[in-house]
Amino acid sequence: MQTIKIYENKGVYKVVIGEPFPPIEFPLEQKISSNKSLSELGLTIVQQGNKVIVEKSLDLKEHIIGLGEKAFELDRKRKRYVMYNVDAGAYKKYQDPLYVSIPLFISVKDGVATGYFFNSASKVIFDVGLEEYDKVIVTIPEDSVEFYVIEGPRIEDVLEKYTELTGKPFLPPMWAFGYMISRYSYYPQDKVVELVDIMQKEGFRVAGVFLDIHYMDSYKLFTWHPYRFPEPKKLIDELHKRNVKLITIVDHGIRVDQNYSPFLSGMGKFCEIESGELFVGKMWPGTTVYPDFFREDTREWWAGLISEWLSQGVDGIWLDMNEPTDFSRAIEIRDVLSSLPVQFRDDRLVTTFPDNVVHYLRGKRVKHEKVRNAYPLYEAMATFKGFRTSHRNEIFILSRAGYAGIQRYAFIWTGDNTPSWDDLKLQLQLVLGLSISGVPFVGCDIGGFQGRNFAEIDNSMDLLVKYYALALFFPFYRSHKATDGIDTEPVFLPDYYKEKVKEIVELRYKFLPYIYSLALEASEKGHPVIRPLFYEFQDDDDMYRIEDEYMVGKYLLYAPIVSKEESRLVTLPRGKWYNYWNGEIINGKSVVKSTHELPIYLREGSIIPLEGDELIVYGETSFKRYDNAEITSSSNEIKFSREIYVSKLTITSEKPVSKIIVDDSKEIQVEKTMQNTYVAKINQKIRGKINLE
């Protein structure tokens, strides 16, 4: 029986069984031995050989949320979940596992939230009331382990403490939340600039362009294809002239080639097998070796490569295939299957590293299976350091895979989804699951990635438009499509659908100051940008059943239409809600019908900064804008912590407002534009306050 020790600090309890060697060290500051016992924490521990099993009771009305990227309902009860990063192309609902492993779940019992985080990057299994109806059973395939119990009482309290432990999210630049376009793949380089010109001519604001693997020379990392991209500096300059950023894909496989500089400089820094030989696999470049990102010297080397690449003017890095994926065994299996008289689908063949791969972590040799899920975390860490080495103030990294702590370095997107009405709904569940697991900067491939090779796809224009609408407030907003898919860039759509997408994209830009203010809050406190309704109303059991609406911060409720219908019923939680489109104020705990294509409701007690220095104020509250200006509203006054420029002020009120007085001096008349909506055109700097009369 291994020894069990419990430490505590500020509502976080660290349970240490034996002498664990965690994939990443999360030191508990000022930890002290706790007087609490396991039973007082509500836990039972069973040690079976090389496994540790942790059990907690599960009440009938208890809710279990979190666990990251899972293709299931957000209330995780009555299912079993595996933490094991895989290349899950063309995944569907209830497929598990997927690309990201976040071994954190949050229990909400009698309105009180408690978090449970297991710091293991091996294949941890969470059984949430499936095998035994009244238990959560966590099986860790290690004889020593550490985990944390995190007290709330609110869900946001748990996430604040969890991200204090694992790291607060980085703050990306504002452009990273703009509209991005991507394709597998855009080339040659003249076509890239031509596409941007077409988009801008048609009135679409493009924040960034992504280049997939075809920009490389023979798929070798940190190279440009000599014919497709003969003048990369010219390409970058042309995009920057148009205020468009360039983001390039960077996989993890280094081609075995004695004339290839990264292969030569990386010798001694690649993954090995148990015999001490190099692990040689197969990836896009062909015969491939893989950086052992667990080694500090490897991360330094990789940071140097990234820094050199960025020095050309590249603005962002897109990390793909980093579960990590290797094609060796898939190729071997495919060769066997091809010799058989029966045909098999091979799109989900084994693409993981073999069992005999080893890594070197903090000077210790460890098996791949023990740390697999943390591989993308260390890759993102090294890539982030590359930005720092290049003295970049603006950092943009997008990663497909991740582990606890990935929020410190990267955005996450949900991988290779398949366009369908079922997937449309699933994407919301996936991004919300990540959001409430400490990963605030998330998104999906708008339009669905997979192309015509998949019979299940739906290429209807209505579905494509609703993908754009679904993701309206997702932190990461990018269209992306496979080589054999339809064009998802709106300029190639019929005029009717093109204009619909334009309205959606422009609305996103209108709300971008609010979204970016929430990004600042995420970086400071660990709060999600978008969140399920139950995050704000955790003591209301009805909210745990709502999976087709989401909150954007505390103040905005969005109910995308995720069916073929043109209207929908919207569940409004308790409180008062303002219909953004017609000014109606509605009492909550109600269900209303929305006929607008983009149902948006503002919660009483909200301040929403909009593009063009506009503000919407509804009720009494306070809010910190992305520029750190504190805005506080009461029944008859709006105060500002410092001087800011306001072009237009929209006041939502059931009581009439006739005029405002700026800084006790300038009187401005107010126009009623629709019910409960009063607009003042200010167009000046405000030093201190606005009075409402």
Swiss-Prot record:
Reaction catalysis annotation? Hydrolysis of terminal, non-reducing (1->4)-linked alpha-D-glucose residues with release of alpha-D-glucose
**Catalytic center at which residues?**
D320, E323, D416
> If you read the UniProt record, what top EC class would you report for this enzyme, in one word?
hydrolase
Q: Name one Pfam family in it.
A: Glyco_hydro_31_3rd
What does the UniProt entry say about where the protein is found?
Answer: Cytoplasm
Q: Which domain of life is it from?
A: Archaea
Listed A to Z, the keywords are:
Cytoplasm, Glycosidase, Hydrolase
Q: Which GO terms describe its biological process?
A: carbohydrate metabolic process
Predominant place of localization: cytoplasm
Q: Which GO terms describe its molecular function?
A: alpha-1,4-glucosidase activity; carbohydrate binding; hydrolase activity, hydrolyzing O-glycosyl compounds
In the Enzyme Commission scheme, what number(s) does this protein have? 3.2.1.20
Q: Which GO terms describe its cellular component?
A: cytoplasm
Q: PANTHER family, per this entry?
A: ALPHA-GLUCOSIDASE (PTHR22762), HETEROGLYCAN GLUCOSIDASE 1 (PTHR22762:SF120)
- Function in brief: Major soluble alpha-glucosidase.
Instruction: Give the similarity note.
Output: Belongs to the glycosyl hydrolase 31 family.
Q: What is this protein called?
A: Alpha-glucosidase
From what organism does this protein derive?
A: Saccharolobus solfataricus (strain ATCC 35092 / DSM 1617 / JCM 11322 / P2)
